[in-house]
């Protein structure tokens, strides 16, 4: 299931009764702040998980279509590690 910021704002509106525009502003502000923090340092959301930007150096790779060797460019990746509580919550119905 894909959930959008608009859907989260709609759920806040339905749950709390605040105006749609206020809910959209709050959701946008929360995501903007989370992204700003995650770019600079490890971000831990208690009982949810942690986000961290990791740098991957360039490395050799293979183009599967041509079978030729290529160099994969360095890049930053976002790593998410779920908390133990979130893992337990997801797996409690199994």
From Swiss-Prot:
GO CC annotation terms, alphabetical: cytosol
InterPro entries membership: Hist_DNA-bd, IHF-like_DNA-bd_dom_sf
GO MF annotation list: DNA binding; structural constituent of chromatin
Keywords: DNA-binding
Cited Pfam families: Bac_DNA_binding (PF00216)
SUPFAM superfamilies, sorted: IHF-like DNA-binding proteins (SSF47729)
Superkingdom assignment: Bacteria
Similarity comment: Belongs to the bacterial histone-like protein family.
Classification via PANTHER family: DNA-BINDING PROTEIN HU, INTEGRATION HOST FACTOR SUBUNIT ALPHA
Protein's UniProt name: Histone-like DNA-binding protein
Taxonomic source organism: Rickettsia bellii (strain RML369-C)
């Amino acid at each position: 299931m894909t959930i959008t910021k608009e859907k989260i704002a709609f759920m806040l509106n339905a749950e709390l009764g605040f105006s749609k525009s206020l809910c959209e502003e709050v959701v946008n502000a929360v995501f903007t702040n989370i992204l700003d923090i995650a770019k600079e340092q490890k971000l831990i959301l208690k009982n949810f998980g942690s986000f961290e930007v990791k740098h991957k150096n360039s490395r050799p790779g293979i183009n599967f279509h041509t079978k030729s060797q290529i160099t994969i460019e360095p890049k930053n990746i976002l790593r998410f590690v779920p908390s133990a509580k979130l893992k337990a919550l997801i797996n409690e119905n199994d």
